[in-house]
């Protein structure tokens, strides 16, 4: 027993008491051991927090390297509070600070590419980057949505969508667009009348009309007027949930929570539309919307496969590319991405178009003259694709508007691996890399007086040729916007049709020229307007 006691005492820790018997410990270590032994819970907490702050700062400084950015990061959150209320002036200052700049928000290290060449390099480097959106986006759009595909899988899926935006296809969608504009232009007149002729902020109305036009273009009349109105009203919640800085998780009664509920509603409605379209297309119905065109391609592909199985492929024309039969939910997801890609951008462009044409009666008069002429004096006459394409001045107005007030000012990507963007800077793997389009579109070396709205650049000038590499409104590279021709023709149809059916006045405020950032850009005062019926 004494031997056991002797052995046990021989292996007692030096921390068992404040004195260490015959162990000779330097006083510095003695002090540290004493402090650790007597440390309380809060001491440990503060020490851990200090270590985390130090790690956060060191990681930021190492990632930042030689590019422009704050010397130190606000612990953990970075400029998160500023990002909750994004200011265009703040973004512009960041872009102007250098070709590359950075910030760090929570765990995200963000590099901003501001020049034309830097932006183009990002757009054209699929080996290093892939498009990304906010953390909550897969929960809204669906984790298996095609927009999250990369490489060959993305290219192959995209090939099956290209046929939906050909000239022939776009002409089929025109009647649905005209119908929606006729309905909403009457609504604009009623709004002004109900307001007693006083100006009403129309930004939210433009969001609603562009959403309705998109729904009619994408899913036709498979969706009810009530459902279109509901989607148009609720899509604002989806946009708010997908802002660049937002909570990465869905908590009850947050923006993300409301956005998820709205997204689920849209997906459910579009799934119903897909089921109806399959029945109608299989019965030989005519194509009236994008969903019809895509499902018809699936049906034709299925017929060819069955003919091939029977050894009779020569009896059926082989579609190119061959598509599989997607289920209703997959179709719904894809159509939802079209709405996601178009809604905010076209809403922004529509708002600025109505504002700037009201401010520039010389421009509006020329648009009106061109459009009434092509309609042979009948303001209610629908347009064919040939007529729409012949509106050279109207299309120049749209082209310049998109340069002057580009709806999408930043396009977020994530680096798949370390990206040597310049000779002296490599963007770390996993960083968010954001090319901006605004600086390229306002480059004074390419565009004279770039801050001035001047449609003549594209009507009689050389902006198309000089700015061929600068016009990044729809991106470039493998992820360029599929619907860029559709978007521009749709906007030309809208403003041209409005010019012959309506008169409108912009009631300027001190904030009319200030830019509000809400996914895209809008006038800060939401564009107060009044409308009257055009009398010829």
Swiss-Prot record:
Record-linked SUPFAM superfamilies: Cytochrome P450
User: Which residue ranges traverse the bilayer?
Assistant: 41-61
Cofactors (names): heme
Membrane topology field: Single-pass membrane protein
The record ties this protein, via InterPro entries, to: Cyt_P450, Cyt_P450_CS, Cyt_P450_E_grp-IV, Cyt_P450_sf
Q: Which reaction does it catalyse?
A: 5-dehydroepisterol + NADPH + O2 + H(+) = ergosta-5,7,22,24(28)-tetraen-3beta-ol + NADP(+) + 2 H2O
EC numbers listed for it are: 1.14.19.41
Q: Where mainly located?
A: endoplasmic reticulum
GO molecular function list: heme binding; iron ion binding; monooxygenase activity; oxidoreductase activity, acting on paired donors, with incorporation or reduction of molecular oxygen
Q: Name one Pfam family in it.
A: p450
Effect of gene knockout? Leads to a severe decrease in conidiation and virulence when ERG5B is also deleted. The absence of both ERG5A and ERG5B seems not to affect the ergosterol production.
Q: For this UniProt entry, what's an example GO CC term? A: endoplasmic reticulum membrane
PANTHER family registered for this protein in UniProt: C-22 STEROL DESATURASE ERG5, CYTOCHROME P450 26
This chain belongs to the protein called: C-22 sterol desaturase ERG5A
Q: Which organism is it from?
A: Gibberella zeae (strain ATCC MYA-4620 / CBS 123657 / FGSC 9075 / NRRL 31084 / PH-1) (Wheat head blight fungus)
